[in-house]
Amino acid sequence: RDLVRSRGLGDVYKRQGVGLPLYPPKGARVIRLLQEWLRRDLYARGYEEVITPHIYKSDVWKTSGHYNFYNENMYFFEINEGSKEAPRMQEYGVKPMNCPGHVLLYKNDIHSYRDLPLRLFEFGTVYRHELSGAVHGLLRARGFTQDDAHVFCTRDQVVDEVVAILDLVDHIMKTFDFTYEAEISTRPEKSIGSDDMWEHATNALKEACNRHNLPYDINEGDGAFYGPKIDIKVKDAIGRTWQCSTVQVDFNLPERFELTYRTAENTEERPWMLHRAIFGSIERFFGILIEHYAGALPLWLAPVQVALLPLADRHVAVSYTHLRAHETVLDL
């Protein structure tokens, strides 16, 4: 937090609400540079960008299961969609996750096996009611942006898609000189999905790690109720471990929203759905980078990349106009 404040990268004071960071120009530049860098890479890897709303009617959260199983971590409110004379109150929920929006986008179209895999990504801001004692600067906030993506694919495509995601993880982590380790969390006692689905999904995650020559630990019974997952934990410059990337198989949402695709035999099947985040929370990753580099970010990611010392006042306007025209961020 001291590094963030002293370098003018962010405001994590409580006047705007606990866990709701503000970003002045320098901090916003770093966030945008991270997003643009990842966006170019994702386009090259066959992802398509989407934008989804911050709020949904509560019916969406009831269908997804969040209303019953995650409501203590959500923000709900009512608005009058009628008139003063004939009020009609409608409850909405602020999104804690981007998944339902991507699922609704998938459901809005008819899909063939030829369309799969479909890779949708978004830099989506989410809000979670974390306990005030658990909030910690940028590393654990109540409002944060995730580099969320959801891959809709066939059962036979799962391994290849997870391998591709792990390749992306490796590229990102090596760019920032992070060492990292993987952990596969398996089926908990309470879960949905058949034994066959869980076995296939868990084996797919293991096979993907093996094909990527990525060692992993097994965290027995710590998967989500809707599917197994791979967690990527990074080590910073002084050896501290941070949770970042996640690859999650989701049996829940395709079932709840009744997603389908048309097979080569002209029958309907449920797609498999992979949730993945590379940075995780961009704010959290930003905070980890600041800690990792002790505030001295790589040049390409630095909020100010050029500083000019004018010899005379008349040089200021000329220098400013010329460099701004070339989209150069500078201090004069």
How would you describe each model-predicted region?
Residues I79, S83, K174-V247:
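Metal-assisted phosphate- and nucleotidyl-transfer catalytic regions
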